[in-house]
A protein has these predicted regions:
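A short catalytic or substrate-binding loop motif that flags glycine-/basic-rich loops and adjacent residues
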Residues: 192-194, 216-219
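Short, hydrophobic/aromatic-rich segments at coil-to-beta transitions
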Residues: 207-214
Length: 226
């Protein structure tokens, strides 16, 4: 969960249509040799992170990550957020407007570099998010759909030791564990120094005196939890 598995992309060329096929993506990842020794460095797993974690959830619980998230987190919190949007909600989704420069690679851009390969397979565009196929699919690292209120409500769990509205959704121990640094150093994809806990970015340990974690996504979304 700290982008250190060495599987930030795949040697096999995957298309945008492939990202909608859960079994194909997880099978390709299972067959993929890590691009670096796992646990030795982070490298932003832009799309693959969701499949790696989601498959673990599926094998343990028997349901997809989208369904698990809905049943265990979104529904109890009445949070208007989906991983895999029902057709009935499509009319409520605003089209994503790509930034003028969508190149987020800050590291080595040589064609055979880890950074370049990560965004080559699978290669996606912000405009892909406007399609019905994208919205229906479960691509947990990239296609969660919600509004600002739902994002704030869900992340409030971490700020309150997993407790909200009279419910203990996540254990306090798990919340504290998320804030613990797991890996820190030069990220092999971003090309910037990064620190990661469990699933979230962290302020570098020597400066993180307030237990802050954060993450963001397309469309300018960002959550900072204190």
């Amino acid at each position: 969960m700290n982008h250190a598995a060495g599987l930030s992309g795949m040697d096999e060329m995957m298309t945008i249509e492939d990202t909608y096929d859960w079994d194909k993506m997880t099978r390709a990842l299972a067959e993929q040799a890590p691009w670096w020794e796992p646990g030795t460095a982070s490298g932003y797993h832009a799309l693959t992170q969701g499949y790696l974690i989601g498959e673990v959830v599926k094998r343990i619980t028997g349901v997809s990550l989208g369904r698990f998230f809905n049943e265990e987190i979104a529904s109890p919190l009445q949070a208007d957020f989906y991983i895999g949007v029902p057709d009935s909600e499509f009319s409520r989704i605003g089209d994503l407007v790509p930034p003028p420069n969508s190149d987020i690679i800050g590291g080595d851009t040589a064609i055979d570099s880890i950074a370049a390969k990560t965004f080559k397979s699978p290669s996606i565009s912000a405009l892909d998010s406007r399609t019905d196929a994208w919205r229906r699919a479960e691509i947990p690292a990239a296609n969660g759909h919600g509004n600002a209120r739902s994002v704030a409500k869900i992340h409030t769990l971490l700020a309150n030791d997993g407790y909200i509205n009279g419910q203990q959704i996540i254990s306090a121990e798990t919340c504290r564990s998320i804030m613990q640094p797991r890996i820190q150093g030069m990220d092999l994809v971003f090309g910037n120094p990064m620190a990661f806990g469990l699933g979230f970015g962290l302020i570098p340990a020597e400066k993180n005196t307030r237990n802050l974690c954060f993450w963001g996504g397309w469309g300018g979304s960002r959550a900072i939890i204190d």
